[in-house]
């Protein structure tokens, strides 16, 4: 079923303008997730980046609840004494009854307070709690599924903590508990089963069954309504996990997902329509001048070029100044992440560049962690050879410079035949001989444990991209997370992204997609799909995404072969751009970062919490969603200049990096369109804050503050049949 644009649950103008009148003085927020100070996947990034904006709203009444891990506490958490007597009594009570509960400050931006529950120390109660879970929720958990057993322990400990916290407070606060993913969902179900006075929110960042089904090469999105979910979950031996996730979704006062595409998925697989969509954001750090991030791109690109010089030693027969760096990164899910489509498109791009005699070279990086045992010896040797050449060149340069200096010092021109002696030539010849090798540069930087069956390497063998001299597309598979301490490519992920020209993420299953969002914030164009949350969000809010360096690949309504052809077209068109066009496009891409800032996207979470308070405490809070008029639909406009990446445009100020100057292809200035980057940037930044909508009373807090609305019938809030989005914008259909 196609995405509906008539009812938008992620439209910026649909959000209420909350003011300080909404009283949170006697309210406490607990955000519960398995990835609090415990990096496992993308939820860690969500919590880490969102902590500051949430802390600004809730102050000292904001706490994160997660599992205790020795590594996480040692490197990320400062252990502290609880700041309030009630919280201290809560922890003391639990610790005296056989639990181990720790309190501290997570050392990230915003410095939120965290409560860490030691799951392993409570394993003595596992069987009893599993029995209670069966009696209460009819969910049985097998003994062999350690992850599910940990979820049971974590859920019961979380519920115990929340119940104890409420009991230790003489004046009962209004508690909001926000649970992320199925691993934390048991706690939500138990809160409702034990009738704790807690407003609950459940956010699914990706459905369990959806991820499994997409990995099985099924036509997922066109058959959503046809799946027998119980049968599919049972066949994949995840039925108990699926039950945990579905129960949490149905028990929550407010159910949210991270994107519209995941909302549709959840409606069919979890059988509840989300109340609101809460897109993921980032902490955007703006530069004081436009050229700063362009110069960072040039510096990071130079680091990547050093690696390429070593990796391709002996076959460095291409111009690095005419080389583009593409990359794909993420969890190693070959088809879900679109690595299969990317490889096929690279093979077709290689053919197009060769038959058209292009001087452009593309180096495509695959940054996907896989099972390895050590570095590839040939790759290490390449970096050693590069360093040896650099040392040789510096030695000869110093001797040459000293002789030149001495000659000029006595007032005579140097004799060029005496500037380099025989020893220097011998040293240089030995360095040249060291660069010779018979084999092609390696495709993989590490030795893989399952080389013969690895999906990426198997596909590369099939399509024949072996990094030969004739290939215009080179492939480098780096099956490890990037690190600035690596002996091969000593850069961290952020620096690597800044140095690349294009991020390619043709995912088939991507509920949100932080990787293209990170590219956008850093001013790097990216390719996403209309099956990713990020792609759908950008497609909805930008009139012409490609003009801003956001290319949306159609993987929903096209066949796999057609999608490969479209991706090839995107890549080839990008290769045809001049440096100047890429500079202008990077400027535009970076300006979109305002759309992804938590300062704006954090309001979706704010609205979800207000909705939950109104449902759980109808005598104290009321909530009425705001509906924008049809004329208030928000879309980021096309850039003022035409064409989208103008080759006939004049730069008004030196925003490009110093090493990316180039002539205007012989075109006189009067033939081109005047292009003022500062003026266009000012227009775009104004658009992110406009249009304004009329104020409407939407909330009441009887515990303090002034009245903002008449009370509403909260019975309509208890049914999840229709999304009560603060952003439900009845906008016109858009093509």
From Swiss-Prot:
<comment type="pathway">
    <text>Glycan biosynthesis; glycogen biosynthesis.</text>
</comment>
<feature type="modified residue" description="Phosphoserine; by CK2">
    <location>
        <position position="657"/>
    </location>
</feature>
<feature type="binding site">
    <location>
        <position position="515"/>
    </location>
    <ligand>
        <name>UDP</name>
    </ligand>
</feature>
<dbReference type="GO" id="GO:0005978">
    <property type="term" value="P:glycogen biosynthetic process"/>
</dbReference>
<feature type="binding site">
    <location>
        <position position="513"/>
    </location>
    <ligand>
        <name>UDP-alpha-D-glucose</name>
    </ligand>
</feature>
<feature type="modified residue" description="Phosphoserine">
    <location>
        <position position="711"/>
    </location>
</feature>
<dbReference type="GO" id="GO:0004373">
    <property type="term" value="F:alpha-1,4-glucan glucosyltransferase (UDP-glucose donor) activity"/>
</dbReference>
<keyword id="KW-0597">Phosphoprotein</keyword>
<keyword id="KW-0808">Transferase</keyword>
<feature type="modified residue" description="Phosphoserine; by GSK3-alpha and GSK3-beta">
    <location>
        <position position="653"/>
    </location>
</feature>
<keyword id="KW-0328">Glycosyltransferase</keyword>
<protein>
    <recommendedName>
        <fullName>Glycogen [starch] synthase, muscle</fullName>
        <ecNumber>2.4.1.11</ecNumber>
    </recommendedName>
</protein>
<feature type="modified residue" description="Phosphoserine">
    <location>
        <position position="652"/>
    </location>
</feature>
<feature type="region of interest" description="Disordered">
    <location>
        <begin position="629"/>
        <end position="735"/>
    </location>
</feature>
<dbReference type="InterPro" id="IPR008631">
    <property type="entry name" value="Glycogen_synth"/>
</dbReference>
<feature type="binding site">
    <location>
        <position position="586"/>
    </location>
    <ligand>
        <name>alpha-D-glucose 6-phosphate</name>
    </ligand>
</feature>
<feature type="compositionally biased region" description="Basic and acidic residues">
    <location>
        <begin position="682"/>
        <end position="695"/>
    </location>
</feature>
<dbReference type="GO" id="GO:0098723">
    <property type="term" value="C:skeletal muscle myofibril"/>
</dbReference>
<feature type="modified residue" description="Phosphoserine; by GSK3-alpha and GSK3-beta">
    <location>
        <position position="645"/>
    </location>
</feature>
<feature type="modified residue" description="Phosphoserine">
    <location>
        <position position="725"/>
    </location>
</feature>
<feature type="binding site">
    <location>
        <position position="331"/>
    </location>
    <ligand>
        <name>UDP</name>
    </ligand>
</feature>
<feature type="binding site">
    <location>
        <position position="582"/>
    </location>
    <ligand>
        <name>alpha-D-glucose 6-phosphate</name>
    </ligand>
</feature>
<feature type="binding site">
    <location>
        <position position="205"/>
    </location>
    <ligand>
        <name>UDP-alpha-D-glucose</name>
    </ligand>
</feature>
<feature type="binding site">
    <location>
        <position position="211"/>
    </location>
    <ligand>
        <name>UDP-alpha-D-glucose</name>
    </ligand>
</feature>
<feature type="binding site">
    <location>
        <position position="331"/>
    </location>
    <ligand>
        <name>UDP-alpha-D-glucose</name>
    </ligand>
</feature>
<feature type="compositionally biased region" description="Low complexity">
    <location>
        <begin position="698"/>
        <end position="735"/>
    </location>
</feature>
<feature type="modified residue" description="Phosphoserine">
    <location>
        <position position="412"/>
    </location>
</feature>
<feature type="modified residue" description="Phosphothreonine">
    <location>
        <position position="700"/>
    </location>
</feature>
<feature type="binding site">
    <location>
        <position position="512"/>
    </location>
    <ligand>
        <name>UDP-alpha-D-glucose</name>
    </ligand>
</feature>
<feature type="modified residue" description="Phosphoserine; by AMPK and PKA">
    <location>
        <position position="8"/>
    </location>
</feature>
<feature type="modified residue" description="Phosphoserine">
    <location>
        <position position="729"/>
    </location>
</feature>
<dbReference type="Pfam" id="PF05693">
    <property type="entry name" value="Glycogen_syn"/>
</dbReference>
<comment type="function">
    <text>Glycogen synthase participates in the glycogen biosynthetic process along with glycogenin and glycogen branching enzyme. Extends the primer composed of a few glucose units formed by glycogenin by adding new glucose units to it. In this context, glycogen synthase transfers the glycosyl residue from UDP-Glc to the non-reducing end of alpha-1,4-glucan.</text>
</comment>
<keyword id="KW-0021">Allosteric enzyme</keyword>
<feature type="binding site">
    <location>
        <position position="501"/>
    </location>
    <ligand>
        <name>alpha-D-glucose 6-phosphate</name>
    </ligand>
</feature>
<feature type="binding site">
    <location>
        <position position="39"/>
    </location>
    <ligand>
        <name>UDP</name>
    </ligand>
</feature>
<feature type="binding site" description="in other chain">
    <location>
        <position position="291"/>
    </location>
    <ligand>
        <name>alpha-D-glucose 6-phosphate</name>
    </ligand>
</feature>
<dbReference type="GO" id="GO:0019901">
    <property type="term" value="F:protein kinase binding"/>
</dbReference>
<feature type="modified residue" description="Phosphothreonine">
    <location>
        <position position="719"/>
    </location>
</feature>
<keyword id="KW-0320">Glycogen biosynthesis</keyword>
<feature type="modified residue" description="Phosphoserine">
    <location>
        <position position="11"/>
    </location>
</feature>
<comment type="subunit">
    <text>Part of the GYS1-GYG1 complex, a heterooctamer composed of a tetramer of GYS1 and 2 dimers of GYG1, where each GYS1 protomer binds to one GYG1 subunit (via GYG1 C-terminus); the GYS1 tetramer may dissociate from GYG1 dimers to continue glycogen polymerization on its own.</text>
</comment>
């Amino acid at each position: 079923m196609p995405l509906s644009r008539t009812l938008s649950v992620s439209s910026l103008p649909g959000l209420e303008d909350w003011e300080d009148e909404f009283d949170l003085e006697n309210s406490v927020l607990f955000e519960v997730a398995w990835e609090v100070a415990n990096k496992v996947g993308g939820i860690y990034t969500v919590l880490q980046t969102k902590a500051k904006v949430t802390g600004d709203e809730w102050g000292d009444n904001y706490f994160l609840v997660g599992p205790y891990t020795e590594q996480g506490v040692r490197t990320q958490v400062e252990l502290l004494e609880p700041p309030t007597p009630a919280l201290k009594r809560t922890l003391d009570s639990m610790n005296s009854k056989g639990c181990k509960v720790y309190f501290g400050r997570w050392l990230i931006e915003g410095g939120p307070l965290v409560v860490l529950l030691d799951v392993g120390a409570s394993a003595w109660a596992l069987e009893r709690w599993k029995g209670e879970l069966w009696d209460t929720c009819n969910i049985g958990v097998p003994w062999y599924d350690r992850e599910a057993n940990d979820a049971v322990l974590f859920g019961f400990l979380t519920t115990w903590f929340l119940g104890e916290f409420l009991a230790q407070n003489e004046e009962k606060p209004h508690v909001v508990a926000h649970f992320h993913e199925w691993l934390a969902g048991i706690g939500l179900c138990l809160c409702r089963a034990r009738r704790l006075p807690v407003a609950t929110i459940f956010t699914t960042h990706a459905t369990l069954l959806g991820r499994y089904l997409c990995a099985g090469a099924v036509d997922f999105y066109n058959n959503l309504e046809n799946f027998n979910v119980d049968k599919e979950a049972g066949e994949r031996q995840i039925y108990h996990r699926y039950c945990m996730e579905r129960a949490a979704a149905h028990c929550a006062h407010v159910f949210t997902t991270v994107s519209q595409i995941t909302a549709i998925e959840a409606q069919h697989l979890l059988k509840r329509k989300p109340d609101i969509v809460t897109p993921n954001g980032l902490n955007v750090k703006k530069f004081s001048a436009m050229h700063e991030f362009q110069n960072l791109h040039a510096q990071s690109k130079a680091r990547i070029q050093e690696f390429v010089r070593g990796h391709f030693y002996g076959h460095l027969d291409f111009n690095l100044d005419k080389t583009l760096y593409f990359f794909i990164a993420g969890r190693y899910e070959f088809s879900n992440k679109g690595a299969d489509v990317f490889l096929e498109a690279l093979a077709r791009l290689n053919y197009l560049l060769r038959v058209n005699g292009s001087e452009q070279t593309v180096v495509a990086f695959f940054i996907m962690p896989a099972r390895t045992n050590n570095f590839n010896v040939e790759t290490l040797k390449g970096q050693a050879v590069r360093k040896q050449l650099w040392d040789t060149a510096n030695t000869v340069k110093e001797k040459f410079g000293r002789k030149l200096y001495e000659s000029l010092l006595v007032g005579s021109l140097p004799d060029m035949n005496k500037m380099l002696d025989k020893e220097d030539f011998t040293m240089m010849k030995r360095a040249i001989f060291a660069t010779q090798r018979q084999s092609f540069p390696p495709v993989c930087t590490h030795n893989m444990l399952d080389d013969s069956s690895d999906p990426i390497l198997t596909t590369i063998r099939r399509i024949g991209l072996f990094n030969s001299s004739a290939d215009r597309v080179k492939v480098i598979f780096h099956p490890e997370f990037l690190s600035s301490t690596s002996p091969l490519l000593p850069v961290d992920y952020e620096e690597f992204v800044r140095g690349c020209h294009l991020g390619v993420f043709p995912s088939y299953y991507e509920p949100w997609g932080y990787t293209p969002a990170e590219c956008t914030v850093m001013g790097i164009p990216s390719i996403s799909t209309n099956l990713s949350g990020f792609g759908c969000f950008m497609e909805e809010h930008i009139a012409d995404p490609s003009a801003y360096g956001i290319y949306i690949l159609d993987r929903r309504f096209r066949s796999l072969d057609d999608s490969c052809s479209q991706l090839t077209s995107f890549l080839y068109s990008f290769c045809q751009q001049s440096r100047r066009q890429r500079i202008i496009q990077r400027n535009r891409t970076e300006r979109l970062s305002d759309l992804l800032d938590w300062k704006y996207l954090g309001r979706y979470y704010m609205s979800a919490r207000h909705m939950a308070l109104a449902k759980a405490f109808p005598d104290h809070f009321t909530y009425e969603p705001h509906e924008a008029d049809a004329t208030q639909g928000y879309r980021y406009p096309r850039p003022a200049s035409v064409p989208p990446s103008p080759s006939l445009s004049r730069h008004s100020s030196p925003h490009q990096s110093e090493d990316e100057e180039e002539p205007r292809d012989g075109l006189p200035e009067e033939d081109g369109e005047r292009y003022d980057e500062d003026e266009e940037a000012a227009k775009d930044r104004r658009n992110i804050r406009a249009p304004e909508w009329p104020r409407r009373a939407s909330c009441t807090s009887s515990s303090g503050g002034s009245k903002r609305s008449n009370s509403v019938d909260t019975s309509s809030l208890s049914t999840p049949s229709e999304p009560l989005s603060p952003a439900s914008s009845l906008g016109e259909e858009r093509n």
